[in-house]
């Protein structure tokens, strides 16, 4: 960790705990800042706050008192899930207190170069592939960011010989200032998080911030399958490389069942361990980033032929009395669920879906639901999804949550059927994270399998 002095003796407010807030508070405390943490969860239920208090950090829990901001803070580090129209954030901005997210802090203290991955879908798989390939090549890659490992915590422990492979959400990127990755990658751009950003334009602008401090010495990797991404190529100062399944590009592409990096043959498409066009795109994106790091082809092929996938992303759990069960809790938007559905036979498929209501409808999903054997709906969007199912004459059942959904639908199914949790919605109406939602689904599966 760079022992930077800019935070020493500075009064800093960390708003919102969870993993990233706790990591930021501990790092800032180590750097000599005067840290105050404010979290809405009551102290007696707040393990993170209790641990921070033991470290001598001031904690204020149970509410968000506006007058706290009268204490002349030099900086606010905001949990990325807290919106910018939150009264505490609005008050900070009115007082000209800079508001950042924890990934900006990670950049400031990191001795290691950063590969940053963002986009609507495929981030987690692509991030994991890149890290696995670099490590297979004998390099030292550290997963961090939105993938479950707080960026500042990983950056604190990393050395200059490491590489931080960082998954970045639009929420995190809204709170950067000087953040500059060595390599940035945008997997794709589709409609998402409109409840948070207010518009698709604002959402895409947040994603685009990943490259705002880059120069021609840095590399930006874009998905040339998508016109929207292709059109960004001349809007950055970074050196652009691409990936495509449709044409030869300066980067990685597939042609006639073969994968190339520029004119160099890498492997056969059929050798990829993960099926589907979207996973081919993820693999190509990972190849470009890996080749920029000087990775040998042997390491790329080793990982891409054996990669088993990511937890909560079309994760095969096993069978219950002849019914196959998949956990795709990471599908937090319609497009991700569409991609999941494309790999199954609808006539034998039961879909479990629902979650946070972001204000969108599900008309886009209708063509993918045709001939579905049945659905179970839950969460804030249950009514919208039920109406969609009824419109298509799909048998539909209501449930309270993902665990009960699995238990309650089993009697309706038969051997040979497949049960897929692919919510098409964020988890925050009932769960802290999509990981928590998926873990509870896995637990329900294990209990029912006994």
Curated annotation (Swiss-Prot):
Pathway: Cell wall biogenesis; peptidoglycan biosynthesis. GO terms for cellular component: cytoplasm. ATP binds at residues 119-125. It holds the Pfam family MurD-like_N. SUPFAM superfamilies: MurCD N-terminal domain (SSF51984), MurD-like peptide ligases, catalytic domain (SSF53623), MurD-like peptide ligases, peptide-binding domain (SSF53244). It is found in: Cytoplasm. GO terms for molecular function: ATP binding; UDP-N-acetylmuramoylalanine-D-glutamate ligase activity. Signal peptide: none annotated. GO terms for biological process: cell division; cell wall organization; peptidoglycan biosynthetic process; regulation of cell shape. Its EC number is 6.3.2.9. It is an enzyme of class 6 (ligase). Its main location: cytoplasm. Belongs to the MurCDEF family. Cell wall formation. Catalyzes the addition of glutamate to the nucleotide precursor UDP-N-acetylmuramoyl-L-alanine (UMA). This is UDP-N-acetylmuramoylalanine--D-glutamate ligase. The gene is murD.
